Amino acid sequence: MAKKDTTPMMKQYYEIKEQYPDAFLFYRVGDFYELFEDDAVKGAQILELTLTHRSNKTKNPIPMAGVPHLAVDTYVNTLVEKGYKVALCEQLEDPKKAKGMVKRGIIQLITPGTMMHERPDQAKDSNYLTSVISTNSGFGLAYSDLSTGETFSTHLTDFEGVANELLSLQTREVVYNGHLTEANKDFLKKANITVSEPVKVEGEHAEISYVTQNLTDDAEIKATKQLVAYLLSTQKRSLAHLQVAQSYEPTQYLQMSHTVQTNLELIKSAKTSKKMGSLFWLLDKTSTAMGGRLLKSWIERPLLSVTEITRRQEMVQALLDDYFTREKVIDSLKGVYDLERLTGRIAFGSVNAREMLQLAHSLGAIPDILNSLLETNNPHLQNFAKQIDPLKGIHDLIVNTIVDNPPLLTTEGGLIREGVSDQLDRYRDAMNNGKKWLSEMESHEREVTGINNLKVGYNKVFGYYIEVTNSNKDKVPTDRYTRKQTLTNAERYITPDLKEHESLILEAEAKSTGLEYDLFVKLRENVKKYIPALQKLAKQVASLDVLTNFATVSEQNNYVRPDFTVDKQEINVVNGRHPVVEQVMTAGSYIPNDVKMDQDTDIFLITGPNMSGKSTYMRQMALIAIMAQIGCFVPADSATLPIFDQIFTRIGAADDLISGQSTFMVEMSEANDALQHATKRSLVLFDEIGRGTATYDGMALAGAIVKYLHDKVGAKTLFATHYHELTDLDQTLKHLKNIHVGATEENGKLIFLHKILPGPADQSYGIHVAQLAGLPHKVLREATTMLKRLEKQGAGELQPASEQLDLFTAEEASVPAISDDEKDVLDDIQNVYLADKTPLQVMELVAQWQQELKDKD
């Protein structure tokens, strides 16, 4: 509400701000966007702006901060990335022509889910706005990336499914129509997801009808309508690039919860939350941003159809076999900009001339790609090329209209080529002739007045002028020159002739600039008609980029094409490798392992020391399955796999910070998910189930879970455990086999073999692993003593508290009486490598050890 005794401009500000109380209002004043009141105070702090005040002479000056209009995107992005909303209030008329107060209005509400201007490092990330409708039968869910227009919808039975989709999509904003429980609110808050209210839009909108035209499920239709309505309300313009919503069932793809994707580090490293170290990092050698985004979506949604997988494999094989064609395609792809987002900006009306040329250059690369594919003898590559329309007409239209190096702004001229418009060419002739006259006038005035340094200049305030230095102003002909401006070292004048030509030149410039902008808008609207064709082309190019990328990665890393068994669940991976781990190890040092599970083997019970590679082996199997089902080749000598419908994991020992569950509760929840939903066609990875609780509880639960998986589920399961007692289960469970990760002891030191061997491990080597971790020698000695006592009395014969062994009993006397410091010196002596030491260095080491022992006496 407007304050009393305020100016008309501030009254206008308060009226607009009242409509957007939860958003930062960027209010356009001249060349700046201003923030006022609380927006200014908070915005100055977040954006590191200088906080000033308006109406300083009043009792209550108004806090104010501003940003240049040319840099506004940077500041807006900063706020939106932090979860805030920004309302852009623009001047709706030319201030010079306005009668009274300049009209202003909101041209766009930018929210976390509708941000269009991504940073360069976000080019391969999607930004999904999600809409959720609560119904009697469950939930309708729809989502769209405004920058590309792609739109999807599905329906889910419970909020747990909704939460999983939101996390998997990494959505930053959800439009939600139903009642949220406190638990759901807490989840959304911890997940940093902004919750927005639905909005109603008046009248019929073509976008809503177009996007929902293929949907049949009522919940999906409502969710999609709610999504598009919100976009129309916030963006306040035509959204012609929104694509027809694609309905999907989660069961259409290999299902993996967000937790599974995180555990397997498909898109980000679990430790750093960065791309590096993930499967996406390994596989992403794509040449285009849209190819990178498509690759990410393929990794998150592997296929179930052998036919579709084979189609991708055939393309990968063809590109792998033809190195020169592949390299030519890659070179051409490097010249393709982000067609999807360029198309979005064209529809949005925010594209500039340089981006329009980027579109043309991208289209210019398509014929080279097609020629490379058509020149091969491979029918798969040829058929792919024949389906692509290069849209040559659009390319020619743009390059024949826009100059080679246009300015960034579309409102200051210099955009349009000569010959495009006769009227524009006439304006330019007038401008050129006028400027030629100015040059001739400058020469003439120098000659007439004798002022050799006289010059004709221009600025936006005073227009054209004649500048004369103070040392020559006595030579100025006062009968023709009228003083216009006084400077420190010069005077500026005008003449009647100069004023007359100024009007002609400026009028031509203004009309030329205006006409150029009109011609650019006309070009943009013409290209806009081809948005569906451009979007189709973008998808085809992105797909080719990913498949070419698969061929390159497969060749570089010696991957093999996997085969699939449709009628039986058998795994036969020979010398499989963890695709990511092998890349960060020294070349040739990775130890490959087989995974062979026939019809009669459902469960591998894996034992072996910690740090020996059990978890790597399990993840390796899952990643090979995922790579196979996205159409990529896999890290192995050979691989025959079933088509998995779901993957379940229980890997890692971290609390679930979003749901607030403890480690053990997370263990049980993830285990229950697998027990409830896994089928015979699923892959289950359980690592150290039961470690989050007491020993006997954990062992009992782990054993019961193994038995249930064996008797009731029948899924292919890799079950790693430190409970060696469970290895006896192979006596009663006929589909369970024991395997272990090999290790050996040399000179009292543990050597990991990293090789999977048949049968159970004979010991756990826990104290040796603790030694590798650097635990104090005293702790290790006491642990060794305690272990010997326990082994003597029997692993299962734990005594009552009153009879428990004292860690410091007389038996410890059998341990040599040596201090920790002495042990440190002995370790140094044992570990020193004398071959790379000079005699002098050896003498220095001996002296150092002697001194250390003396100091401890």
UniProtKB/Swiss-Prot annotation:
Q: Which GO terms describe its biological process?
A: mismatch repair
Database matches in PROSITE patterns: DNA_MISMATCH_REPAIR_2
| InterPro entries tied to this protein | DNA_mismatch_repair_MutS, DNA_mismatch_repair_MutS-lik_N, DNA_mismatch_repair_MutS/MSH, DNA_mismatch_repair_MutS_C, DNA_mismatch_repair_MutS_clamp, DNA_mismatch_repair_MutS_core, DNA_mismatch_repair_MutS_N, DNA_mismatch_repair_MutS_sf
* Record-level Gene Ontology MF annotations: ATP binding; ATP-dependent DNA damage sensor activity; damaged DNA binding; mismatched DNA binding
Gene3D superfamilies assigned to the protein according to its UniProt record, in alphabetical order: 1.10.1420.10, DNA repair protein MutS, domain I, MutS, connector domain, P-loop containing nucleotide triphosphate hydrolases
**PANTHER family in alphabetical order:** DNA MISMATCH REPAIR PROTEIN MSH1, MITOCHONDRIAL, DNA MISMATCH REPAIR PROTEIN MUTS FAMILY MEMBER
The record's family statement is: Belongs to the DNA mismatch repair MutS family.
Which protein, by its recorded name, is this? DNA mismatch repair protein MutS
State the taxonomy lineage: Bacteria, Bacillati, Bacillota, Bacilli, Lactobacillales
Gene encoding the protein:
mutS
